[in-house]
């Protein structure tokens, strides 16, 4: 089966498993790198963290550093090399392309290499993330099944019979997932084969000889994580939500007062939650660098309390210096620039402003400059350590 990107996204992503076979030369160029064309070359050049285990004896894996992958492989162990992105040029860009293709936030994808000796692999488990397995060397079988007991699992990998993490309990009030209740399908993987497994797919593997594959794993934040992150930023702006529930763990009148306080908080919650937008949620997943690359009129900023903008007139222009303080209390100059006459008013305003503000509000207060110029000034002061780009909308707008 050969699928176009549109066909895959329309009919399979993110909830249906699918696979396709083809030649290695159809794969992205980074996956055709010489180091990934030879297990000997990979184990000789890889210097990062290694997780190893033996599916013949159980699901347990151990992660170590500063060890020879080749030595572990000769001991009959299956290996997972988690840091190949440092070794293979172009893998970082490939991950960003994968994220963009499915509308996932930057940084949520990772890639690792699996090496397994003959008749080994991984024991039956399910992952709480989307997985693309790409076979590069050798052959192996995937046995997969749609997990019936728990839709959209959250948290970590679940291995039946292993110690269960706490977040699985509220997800499994009807009983924990059981692979014995599922019907498995065998997928034959050859060099060039690609398998997509939605989160929650039961799977185990068996190799037919020495095998090398890579997995591209996407872990976008769940709705729970995204909404709670956005909601937290709004609640922290309200002193009523910052106040502890004093007396809640006490008795009598103390607990009654805490219960009244809690009731009032819950009554205010719908209005606060209804004010959230998808953009509020999106912003929580971006790094500061991502936000810097996408500044716009609705971007918000605040002066860092540990930084100072010093302004000195020099004829018809002004010199601006940013002085910042590090975690050890040391002060140092982070940037210096000459400010032309039309921008002096903006810099004077920025040197005195302490409340959060948007790029649009700053531009409206200084209409002599176009918005694009305001954004360039803001970005320069962000990079200089004077301004903090905010990941939330202030309730009191400036």
Predicted segments with their positions:
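Conserved double-stranded beta-helix
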Residues: 187, 233-293
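Short amphipathic alpha-helical interaction segments
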Residues: 368-383
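Short acidic, hydrophobic short linear motifs in intrinsically disordered regions
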Residues: 342-369
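Acidic, low-complexity/disordered tracts enriched in E/D and polar residues
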Residues: 267-351, 379, 390-398
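Active-site region of the double-stranded beta-helix
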Residues: 1-11, 24-193, 201-251
């Amino acid at each position: 089966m050969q699928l176009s990107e549109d066909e895959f996204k329309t009919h399979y992503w993110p909830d249906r498993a699918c696979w396709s076979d083809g030649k290695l030369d159809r794969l992205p160029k980074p996956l055709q790198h010489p180091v990934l064309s030879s297990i000997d070359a990979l184990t000789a050049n890889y210097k990062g963290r290694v997780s190893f285990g033996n599916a013949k004896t159980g699901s347990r894996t151990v992660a170590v550093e500063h060890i020879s992958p080749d030595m572990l492989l000769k001991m009959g162990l299956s290996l997972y090399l988690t840091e190949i992105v440092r070794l293979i040029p172009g893998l970082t860009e490939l991950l960003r392309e994968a994220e963009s293709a499915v509308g996932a936030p930057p940084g949520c994808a990772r890639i690792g290499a699996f090496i397994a000796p003959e008749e080994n692999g991984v024991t039956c488990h399910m992952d709480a993330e989307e997985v693309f397995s790409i076979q590069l060397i050798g052959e192996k079988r995937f046995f997969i099944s749609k997990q019936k007991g728990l839709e959209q699992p959250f948290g970590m990998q679940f291995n039946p019979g292993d110690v269960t993490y706490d977040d699985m309990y509220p997800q499994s009030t009807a009983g924990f997932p059981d692979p014995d209740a599922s019907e498995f399908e065998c997928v034959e993987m050859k060099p060039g084969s690609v398998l997509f497994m939605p989160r929650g797919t039961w799977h185990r593997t068996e190799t037919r000889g020495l095998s090398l594959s890579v997995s591209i794993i996407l872990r976008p934040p769940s709705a729970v994580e995204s909404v709670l992150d956005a909601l937290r930023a709004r609640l922290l702006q309200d002193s009523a939500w910052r106040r502890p529930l004093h007396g809640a763990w006490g008795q009598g009148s103390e607990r009654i007062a805490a219960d009244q306080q809690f009731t009032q908080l819950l009554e205010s919650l719908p209005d606060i939650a209804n004010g959230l937008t998808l953009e509020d949620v999106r912003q929580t997943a971006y790094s500061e660098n991502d936000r810097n690359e996408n500044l716009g009129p609705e971007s918000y900023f605040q002066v860092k309390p540990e930084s100072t903008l010093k302004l000195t007139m020099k004829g018809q222009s002004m010199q601006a210096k940013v002085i910042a303080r590090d975690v050890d209390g040391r002060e140092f100059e982070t940037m210096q620039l000459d400010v032309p006459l039309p921008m002096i008013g903006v810099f004077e305003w920025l040197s005195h402003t302490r409340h959060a503000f948007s790029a649009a509000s700053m531009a409206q207060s200084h209409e002599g400059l176009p918005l694009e110029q305001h954004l360039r000034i803001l970005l320069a002061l962000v990079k200089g350590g004077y301004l903090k780009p905010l990941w939330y909308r202030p309730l009191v707008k400036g």
